[in-house]
Structure formats: C-alpha cells, structure tokens
Amino acid sequence: MLRVSENGLRFLLKCHSTNVSMFNRLLSTQIKEGRSSIDDAGIIPDGTINERPNHYIEGITKGSDLDLLEKGIRKTDEMTSNFTNYMYKFHRLPPNYGSNQLITIDKELQKELDGVMSSFKAPCRFVFGYGSGVFEQAGYSKSHSKPQIDIILGVTYPSHFHSINMRQNPQHYSSLKYFGSEFVSKFQQIGAGVYFNPFANINGHDVKYGVVSMETLLKDIATWNTFYLAGRLQKPVKILKNDLRVQYWNQLNLKAAATLAKHYTLEKNNNKFDEFQFYKEITALSYAGDIRYKLGGENPDKVNNIVTKNFERFQEYYKPIYKEVVLNDSFYLPKGFTLKNTQRLLLSRISKSSALQTIKGVFTAGITKSIKYAWAKKLKSMRRS
C-alpha cells in the first residue's frame, strides 16, 4: 500500500489539476491561432473532441504538441490509482474538489430529507438520499402514490448505531432485534455490508434506510469490491451529511465510471460519442448481473428512464469529470481493473452481492415487509408512462 502524507496527496491533486488546466489553455491557444480548424461536422482535426448541440462527438489521434501534457496527466492518474488507503482521514481537500457532488434540490424536498435524517438519535458520519423518491424517473404515472424515500446512513460503529436505534425505533426492525445489536451488526456484514429497514414511517414518510459502516462504504467506492454502493453513488444522489473521505474517493469513483462509459459509448457507436448514451452507460454499470433484473423486480427500461428525467443532473454531477475524461482523455480505474477485465469482474461481484443482499433482506425486513417490498417493486417495474 502506498503511503503518502496529506500534503503530498494535495500536491498530487494540484498537479493533476494544473496539468489539465494547462492542457485546456494550450488547446485553446492552438485553436485560436489557427493551428487547428473545426470542420462542418464539429470535429477538431488535431484529435481533441468538440461537443455538438446534439451531444455527438468524434475523435481523431491527437497532435504531438499535446503529448507532454497528456503524459503528465496520465502519470498523475497512475499515481492516484496507486493510493489505496481508503481510511485515510482528510482534514481538507483542494478548493472545489468534488463540489460537483453537492447537488441542490427542491427546498421542500430538502426540508423533508433533512427531517428524516435528523430524526435518528444514533450518530451518522455520512448520509445520502437516492432513487425515485429523491430524483424523479420517467416512465411512471404521477397518479401513483409518492415513492418510498431511500437513504443510506454511513456510521462509524454499526453495533452502537443499532443499539441506540433499536431503543428509539424498535418497530423498524424485524425479529432479529431480539438477538441484540451486536448480532445485527454482524449480520449486516453479509453480502454488501448494508442492513436495510424498509417501510419505516418517519415524519409521515415511507422510508427505506440502509446502515453501513464507513469502512465498508469507503472500501467499496475506492476498490469496487462489491460495487453495491459504488454503483449507487455513480448516479446523482443527494448528500445530506458529507464526509471528506467519501467526497475524495467518490470523485475517483465517478471518474472511473466515466472512463468505462466513454469506452463503451465509442465502442458501440463506431467511435462516435453521444452524451446521452454516455450517461446511460454509467447508469447501466450497477445493474449488470443484478439478480433483481433476472427476477423481474426492476423495470427493464429503468436505465433509460433515470437518464431521461435526470439528464441535466447527470451533467451537473459529472461536469468536471466530463471535461477530464471525455474532453481531455484522462483515464482512471481502481487498482486491478482494466478496460478488458472490468465487465467480467463487475458482473461477478454484482451478481454475488445483489443475491446475498436480496436473501438477507428477507431476514432484516421480516416476511411481511419483504413480501410488501417485493410486490411494490414488481408493480413499479410494470408501470409505463
């Protein structure tokens, strides 16, 4: 494991940012001086990529003038991928690093989500909301009841959290609560390491909340060992309580998702880049091999529905990443992953973690809630606009 001081890590990030900025300035100068001309199809012949209004882009080999800066960017990408201490405690991050993750939402919904989060007496380090209860999806009629709110609670000590929460909200738990908080926290570690309590009534809202240790959360977004939470965080989420460690590693998680999505988009579109398809590829990553799809528990059009309704949110969420990966050709994948082996590795890990989480859910939710949840998911998957 590479060890690096916080100052060293900030220097590494600053170097990367400086290289990208210099790359952009040099590219801009080249274009302004006429060393590159833009053809009618929206292509920059020196090999950079130019976004068109319809989101189609085509790339050609870069000119030699940019090689040096490209190498600098790739070198810092490589050094970053070798830093794997996901439990490292950051006191601060470079200005604006990861600020794209802090999405704003409707004030009324923000108030509701803050109310749900603050209702827990047990301490949490990181909290985010996700899913159709936070971000609307296309393909579902507005006449249906408001969807369940999904949130994830990152905690330092799961046993301590469950001990306090069981006393405050015993009705949220299945009969597993009778075995005590220590047992529940150990049971939580099965599969992806998340303990879900669905259909919890909190401040008049139907809420499904998952409890995960910070170590499990950070390990997944840094190394993709299960891809269960890393995949969720690759789609727009609403962060309700932030943690700098998550902000740092999730920025790399987004960059890795963009790296794969760009590759798959170009591969499927004869080397033409489509921004809508790019976000669909990102969204689809976490559903490959998901047992819920095999069992018909998810809408087969879910990926398209998510991106259709949230295209601008994806643009906001990935704004600096898009510039780095798509426009400047930066590349990042977690250690051990390559463009050739990623599909195989993710398929295996997602299949395993989703299957174990589904089985575990029968015990954590209880039979009645499990049937209710499965039926709700089935009905939701059958709805069409």
From Swiss-Prot:
Q: What is its EC number?
A: 2.7.7.41
Q: Where does the record place it?
A: Mitochondrion inner membrane
Q: Which domain of life is it from?
A: Eukaryota
Extract the InterPro entries matched here.
Answer: Tam41
Q: In which pathway does it act?
A: Phospholipid metabolism; CDP-diacylglycerol biosynthesis; CDP-diacylglycerol from sn-glycerol 3-phosphate: step 3/3
Q: What is the effect of changing D220A?
A: Completely abolishes the enzymatic activity
Q: What does it catalyze?
A: a 1,2-diacyl-sn-glycero-3-phosphate + CTP + H(+) = a CDP-1,2-diacyl-sn-glycerol + diphosphate
Which molecular-function annotations from GO does this UniProt entry contain? phosphatidate cytidylyltransferase activity
Its GO biological process terms? cardiolipin biosynthetic process; CDP-diacylglycerol biosynthetic process
User: What other facts are recorded?
Assistant: Present with 195 molecules/cell in log phase SD medium.
| Cofactors | Mg(2+); Co(2+); Cu(2+)
| Ribonucleoprotein in keyword set | no
Q: How does inactivating the gene affect the organism?
A: Deficient in cardiolipin. Blocked in the import of presequence-containing proteins as well as of non-cleavable carrier proteins into mitochondria.
Q: How does activity depend on pH?
A: Optimum pH is 7-9.
Query: Source species, please?
Result: Saccharomyces cerevisiae (strain ATCC 204508 / S288c) (Baker's yeast)
Q: Which residues cross the membrane?
A: none
Name one cellular component (GO) term.
mitochondrial matrix
Any idea which UniProt keywords this protein has? Answer: Lipid biosynthesis, Lipid metabolism, Magnesium, Membrane, Mitochondrion, Mitochondrion inner membrane, Nucleotidyltransferase, Phospholipid biosynthesis, Phospholipid metabolism, Transferase
User: Hey, which family's this protein in?
Assistant: Belongs to the TAM41 family.
Q: Does the keyword Lipid metabolism apply?
A: yes
A Pfam family of the record is Tam41_Mmp37
Q: What does this protein do?
A: Catalyzes the formation of CDP-diacylglycerol (CDP-DAG) from phosphatidic acid (PA) in the mitochondrial inner membrane. Required for the biosynthesis of the dimeric phospholipid cardiolipin, which stabilizes supercomplexes of the mitochondrial respiratory chain in the mitochondrial inner membrane.
Membrane topology listed for this record = Peripheral membrane protein
Manner of cofactor binding, per the entry note: Magnesium. Also active with cobalt or copper.
Q: What protein is this chain from?
A: Phosphatidate cytidylyltransferase, mitochondrial
